[in-house]
């Protein structure tokens, strides 16, 4: 039976009206949602700049603060916008959108650090060690940061030295080279000579760098507070303040001088390891004068040395850091290849003690108990030790710490015959990196972060050159001979 034309027309009109009604509703929803999103983003920007208005006027009025804070807040705003849009997306699509946003913003942060340098370079370098907090793509980008800048004019360095000592540079040093050995965002290094003929290197802090760093840290911590509101389990506010403390510590050269003095006392009975002497009479909070150590950088040595010499040096590096950590509880916490030298007689030379870590007796005891807990697979004990060390789950869930403890026990258990050449250990180190990222809601104490930084950095060097070093026996030997 055929449908009459009139009935078909009525049905068509009804269908069209239904489509138009639904379309009108959809458009209305889109407009309403768009206004909601626009309103929330506008409110966010208003809050951000109101917060910035409370900052010291000398800082907030600088073009540098405006540039850095403006870019960081725009980045934070993209995450706020994503969180709003994600309400209307399927979960898998929202996840892909977030991953793409992470990559885009990681590149923006990297570009900002490279452009502005100053304290941002140091913040970025330190931040790259927080692998349990930052998305992997941020760690990837920030790990690339290289702190190299065009040198400051010689005359500027001379003025800095003279202002620190209150007398002409000719009365401080017998000679100081015009060309620097190195130039970075925070300091410049020149070779010089004392009046007794001793060759030294002089690390001179850049003029006005303290104000620059405070500007950078202020912008960074405010932006981190707003990010913390978006991702509270990550504890970004706490991380930003820890990073700020680390950067500020590097600006006080009396701290670094004390670190070197303590380290030299620590290695006094170890002729194979050296650190530069320091000259307090020609050092201040902003100028550090040290012994000029002649040697070869680590990577060129490893690339050109025989297998026997290469493995002997790598074994010495491993032994030295195990001794620093296990025997003394005071260690160099930034062992990248640029801070490691090979001296005459294939001795190990360490430089740049701006970043070190000291274990308190209580912390040291907890680490010793942790090793025992791992060896005996004592999960309950491991959870208690994590809590005692300062591991805190931002979600307030003890089960999270328990899962993390179980993973660490599984990860760190080694058989006595295992060495770095084993493929299995390569997998363990890879798993270790993944494990750190697995628990972003857990606040990890600074000493553990720095310890992880040491092992990851040295582990990368060892794995690249594949030495036959038995870590288990080495650590056990250090524990048995420990002095603490």
What does each of the following model-derived ranges do?
Residues 192-193, 335:
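Conserved beta3 strand of the Hanks-type protein kinase catalytic N-lobe
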Residues 136, 143-150, 162, 210-215, ...:
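ATP-dependent phospho-/nucleotidyl transfer catalytic cores
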Residues 1-188, 214-236, 469-470, 474-477, ...:
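N-terminal accessory/targeting segments that precede structured cores
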Residues 7, 47-61, 88-89, 93, ...:
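Helix-rich C-lobe and terminal helical cap/extension of kinase-like folds
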Residues 191, 198-206:
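Glycine-rich ATP phosphate-binding loop
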Residues 338-342:
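Hydrophobic residue at the +6 position relative to the catalytic HRD Asp in the kinase catalytic loop
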Residues 196-198, 347:
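Short acidic/polar mixed-charge low-complexity motifs
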Residues 119, 183-186, 283-288, 453:
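Core structural elements
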